[in-house]
A protein has these predicted regions:
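Solvent-exposed soluble domains appended to multi-pass membrane proteins
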Residues: 1-237
């Protein structure tokens, strides 16, 4: 959260997220369940606390959980998960298919020339890929639940050659890019017939160290933004 101007960032790194914050039901005091992506996904989607030294999505026998994806599936929703990297990373493909998701899209689905590093494709490609898939689901007339896991603000950073950041450090340039890619996704989504009937929930899976570490587990590791946006809801904080 501390990369956003609303939470004290002196530079304007996230103009789109900052603007979306004021147009959403937004939460100032929201904290992640852990400090790794698997912690955030597990807690957010299935409402179980993270086990700090254990990845509960891994294992030869995949446990079944009740959570948002499974409850929605029981009520007629079609569930899709989009990630940038390989499906086997953190056992995500097998875990999510076992626990409520109908389709999982990962690096294996994307053109090889779009893979830029060990974390697969970049955010803007993931968003561009997702739009037509969501259009196909919307055309069926059935409700859908889609989870998009972005990755760009995670080292190793890759700044696309077509993106021109205003700052000079890779750590801030990648934040600018991630914000730009998200803006581009919303601009495209707004053109689709399902946009006005969709609730968008944006949150961080975990934080990162911003500034100096004042204690063993700095607040910035867990303090994350949460925004619930729809063209049909009134903003509040």
């Amino acid at each position: 959260s501390k990369l956003m101007k609303h939470f004290g960032q002196s530079e304007t790194l996230t103009p789109f997220l900052d603007s979306l914050y004021t147009r959403s039901i937004s939460f100032r005091n929201f904290y992640s369940a852990g400090i790794h992506t698997n912690h955030g996904l597990y807690a957010t989607l299935y409402s179980f606390p993270a086990m700090m030294k254990r990845n509960l999505m891994k294992g030869s026998v995949i446990p079944r959980y009740s959570g948002l994806p499974t409850v929605l599936k029981e009520n007629g929703y079609y569930n899709l998960f989009f990630m940038t990297h390989e499906g086997q990373y953190d056992n995500m493909n097998a875990f999510f298919r076992t626990n409520g998701y109908d389709e999982v899209f990962s690096q294996e689905n994307y053109p090889a020339d779009k893979v830029v590093n060990s974390f697969g494709v970049q955010d803007d490609f993931l968003y561009d890929y997702a739009i037509p898939v969501l259009n196909q689901r919307a055309a069926t007339g059935e409700p859908f639940f889609a989870t998009l896991l972005s990755i760009s603000n995670h080292p190793p950073y890759v700044i696309p050659p077509f993106f021109h950041p205003k700052t000079s450090e890779p750590e801030t340039q990648i934040v600018e890019y991630a914000d730009w890619a998200l803006r581009k996704f919303f601009e495209e989504a707004r053109k689709q017939p399902w946009f006005d009937n969709t609730i968008f929930v944006l949150e961080g899976d975990h934080g990162k160290l911003v500034g100096d570490a004042e204690c063993e587990l700095p607040e910035s590791y867990n303090h994350i933004p949460l925004m619930i946006y729809s063209s049909r809801i009134h903003p509040e904080e």
